[in-house]
Regions:
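Membrane-anchoring hydrophobic helices of lipid-metabolizing enzymes
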Residues: 2-91
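Non-catalytic C-terminal accessory region of glycerolipid acyltransferases
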Residues: 2-5, 148-272
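Juxtamembrane loop-helix boundary motifs flanking transmembrane segments in multi-pass membrane proteins
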Residues: 5-13, 139, 146, 242
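Catalytic core of membrane glycerolipid acyltransferases/transacylases, capturing the structured
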Residues: 38-58, 87-144
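Structural element of the ATP-grasp superfamily
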Residues: 64-68, 106, 131, 189, ...
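Amphipathic coiled-coil/heptad-repeat helices and related helical stalk/stem segments
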Residues: 78, 99, 123, 150-151, ...
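Short acidic-hydrophobic, aromatic-tinged amphipathic segments that line or gate anion-handling sites
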Residues: 79, 137-140, 233
Length: 272
């Protein structure tokens, strides 16, 4: 590979540094410019909420689908099933989680969608502001009171006609093997009677993941995003049964995508 190609490491570092810097700069400008809007629209909370959602969705869509690919950080080679599931709003989207880019990429595709985040993120000043003015829900899965309060807030978001995005693994995976699912999203689906839409987000190389070399990955990183058929809760299901059905479906979808990549691992029993 030539010195101007993907394999020239200084060039790779430069491209990714520009990408990271532009993200943090744009996010800071967005938040700073948003403050006057929040103040001006305080008497009109519904208008404020809608405007912020539209602007943030447009920003994330441009950043993840146009700007970062233009820098050569990755290519999105496949997005399937999105048009079929968008009319189902409100719905609960559950996605596998391997890198920090997962959430903003999906939020750039899904308008009017809240997201569940860890409580430790919610304590950070920036996230605290986002939680107040956007549909971010902070939860501590180890605290019953936090889970109960978060379930209630999620139900309000869904009853308002908005989607919810959840990463049921809870944290970024260290391999291609799906981690055990937390039951929060599936308990919520049972209570609200709403479909669960499994989402696969797959990259040929790790990017901002819990793997060495993922900060400056070298090579042609191809992203595939698949929105699978909705899984509807039934009266016979409990949250565990619903979780298991979704887990198996996602694991089957990931297995051929992972084959021959760094994510390729021996499948757990639940693949079968």
């Amino acid at each position: 590979m030539t010195a101007t190609g993907q394999g020239f490491f200084p060039f790779t570092v430069f491209r990714f540094t520009v990408g990271y810097a532009s993200y943090f700069l744009a996010k800071s400008v967005f938040l700073v410019c948003g403050l006057p809007v929040l103040i001006l629209l305080t008497p009109f909370p519904s208008t404020k909420q809608l405007l912020l959602q539209v602007l943030s969705h447009a920003f994330l869509r441009f950043f993840t689908r146009t700007w970062l690919p233009a820098l050569g950080l990755y290519r999105i080679v496949e997005i399937t099933g999105l048009d079929q599931v968008l009319p189902l709003r409100p719905a609960i989207y559950v996605a596998n989680h391997r890198g920090y880019l997962d959430s903003i990429t999906l939020l750039g595709l899904l308008p009017r969608t809240g997201v569940l985040i860890k409580s430790r993120h919610g304590r950070q000043p920036m996230y605290h502001m986002l939680i107040r003015h956007f549909n971010l829900v902070s939860v501590d899965p180890n605290a019953l009171s936090s889970v109960s309060a978060s379930l209630e807030r999620c139900e309000r978001i869904l009853s308002g006609g908005e989607n919810l995005l959840v990463f049921p693994e809870g944290s970024r995976a260290r391999s291609g093997r799906l981690q055990r699912f937390n039951g929060f999203a599936f308990e919520l689906a049972q209570r609200a009677g709403l479909p669960v839409i499994p989402v696969i987000i797959h990259s040929t190389l790790p990017f901002m993941a819990k793997l060495p070399g993922s900060i400056f990955p070298r090579g042609d990183n191809q992203y595939r995003i698949r929105f699978l058929d909705p899984v509807h809760p039934t009266p016979e299901d409990d949250a565990d049964a619903l979780s298991d059905r979704v887990y198996r479906r996602m694991a089957r979808e990931l297995r051929p995508l992972d084959a021959g990549t760094i994510w390729d691992t021996e499948p757990p029993a639940r693949y079968d």
